[in-house]
């Protein structure tokens, strides 16, 4: 069994927050792959199903972000699972909007949900980070993270979540680089192996002190579907606020 845990905060007040993109991701997988209805166990909303022929448990901890590890750790102990049997999906300030990175282990980078998972689940689990961008000023981080996605964010958020859900079998089969390429291409970028060597070399020279500052970039926005489950969900989310 594989646990795919999306991190976020429970309740309608937080549903549209950037910090809740992990919840949005597992919701997308849930809809796309015919999981059981959501139920409550392990202080979480859980759903069982299969992806790519493998048994998967989706989790949305209801403990609030800072205690996510207590919920996920309880489920792992119940099913006698190891860190390798866990994938955590969460928001990442230090990635531009619409970018994704997937790796095993690593640090928490100040993310309280990941701090909690590290404490209760071990550190060698897979981490799927979904970029929400950085506001550029440290004092603005909290409002940015706990603020709702803007309507304009639909241009990258919908294809990101759609592509992740469509290719969740790659996530289950540990085909990490293939999944990252699918997401990059869906967002109008290039597959990882297609990056010029000079670009990779230059990227490695970027000072660590600048990691929180991202310059605005112009990308060709992908054409979005007007209908479908993801479109309906995002219309409801963005429709809560005026233009």
UniProtKB/Swiss-Prot annotation:
The active site is at residue 19. It catalyses: an N-acyl-L-alpha-aminoacyl-tRNA + H2O = an N-acyl-L-amino acid + a tRNA + H(+). One of its GO terms (biological process) is protein quality control for misfolded or incompletely synthesized proteins. The record marks 91 as: Stabilizes the basic form of H active site to accept a proton. Transmembrane segments: none annotated. Coiled coil: none annotated. This is Peptidyl-tRNA hydrolase. It comes from Rhizobium johnstonii (strain DSM 114642 / LMG 32736 / 3841).
């Amino acid at each position: 069994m594989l646990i795919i845990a999306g991190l976020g905060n429970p309740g309608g007040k937080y549903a549209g927050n950037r910090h809740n993109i992990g919840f949005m991701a597992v919701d997308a997988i849930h809809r796309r792959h015919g999981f059981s209805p959501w139920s409550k166990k392990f202080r979480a909303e859980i759903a069982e199903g299969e992806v790519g022929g493998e048994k998967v448990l989706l989790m949305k901890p209801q403990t609030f972000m800072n205690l996510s590890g207590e919920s996920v750790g309880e489920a792992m102990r119940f099913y006698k699972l190891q860190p390798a049997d866990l994938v955590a999906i969460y928001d990442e300030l230090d990635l531009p909007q619409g970018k994704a990175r997937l790796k095993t282990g690593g640090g928490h980078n100040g993310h309280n949900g990941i701090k909690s998972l590290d404490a209760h689940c071990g550190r060698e689990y897979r981490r799927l980070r979904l970029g929400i961008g950085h506001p550029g000023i440290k004092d603005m981080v909290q409002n940015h993270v706990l603020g709702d996605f803007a309507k304009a964010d639909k241009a990258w958020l919908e294809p990101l979540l759609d592509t992740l859900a469509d290719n969740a079998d790659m996530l289950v089969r540990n085909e990490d680089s293939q999944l990252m390429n699918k997401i990059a291409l869906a967002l109008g970028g290039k597959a990882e192996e297609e990056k010029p060597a000079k670009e990779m070399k230059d990227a490695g020279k970027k000072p660590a002190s600048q990691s929180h500052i991202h310059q605005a970039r112009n990308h060709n926005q992908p054409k979005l579907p007007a209908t479908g489950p993801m479109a309906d969900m995002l219309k409801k989310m963005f429709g809560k606020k005026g233009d």
